[in-house]
A protein has these predicted regions:
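Short, contiguous alpha-helical
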Residues: 8-75, 117-166
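Acidic catalytic patch
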Residues: 102-118
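Basic/polar N-terminal segments that are highly enriched at the extreme N-terminus
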Residues: 1-8
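Generic detector of well-ordered alpha-helical segments enriched in charged/polar residues
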Residues: 8, 59, 83-86, 109
Length: 166
């Protein structure tokens, strides 16, 4: 289905695209970053925060660790400080890249089991599918942020995968 090489490529793409969005958002005021723009998570900042949290959640599952303490609701407002967010985003990018660097093709086989926040239902899915969800989820929400930034007059970089420098 997918390979460790695919994961390393997508991790690099993730880092590049996150840097593009953060750089573009740097040109906005804090008020502009938190402005409700009618998107699913309302604002640029809330959507970026959600993505930061979800990366931690999915990585924790893939590593066999406990879920992050923050809930999805909390993920929309924290971190609230832009400088803090930027530092944390860089760390999370590094975490994703380090995870993928250690990954072997065999690590993508088998099933992943977890319980959602309320602990009510056992979920079991193919591990490769969960890894694909990590990257698909990132792309989905970054597309929303890209659209909001563009509408706000900012200029994020192109998103085409073939534009990623080797």
């Amino acid at each position: 289905m997918i390979s460790a090489g695919y994961c390393r490529l997508m991790s690099r793409y993730n880092t590049w695209q996150n840097a593009s969005l953060v750089t573009a958002a740097d040109g906005l005021t804090n008020e502009d970053r938190w402005k409700n723009r009618g998107a699913f998570f309302q604002s640029i900042a809330a959507t970026l925060n959600h993505l930061y949290w979800a990366d931690a959640l999915i990585l924790a599952r893939l590593k066999g660790n406990e879920r992050p303490e923050e809930t999805i609701k909390h993920s929309l407002t924290s971190p609230s400080d832009w400088a803090d967010f930027k530092a944390l985003r860089l760390q999370r990018n590094e975490e994703v890249e380090e995870w993928s660097a250690r990954l072997r093709d065999a690590d993508l086989g088998g099933m992943l089991v977890w319980y959602p926040g309320d602990g009510s239902t056992r979920i079991e899915k193919p591990k490769a599918l969960c890894v694909m969800q990590l990257f698909n989820h990132q792309t989905h929400h970054r597309g929303q942020v890209h659209a909001m930034l563009t509408a706000a007059g900012a200029k994020p970089e192109p998103t085409d995968l073939q534009m990623l420098e080797y």
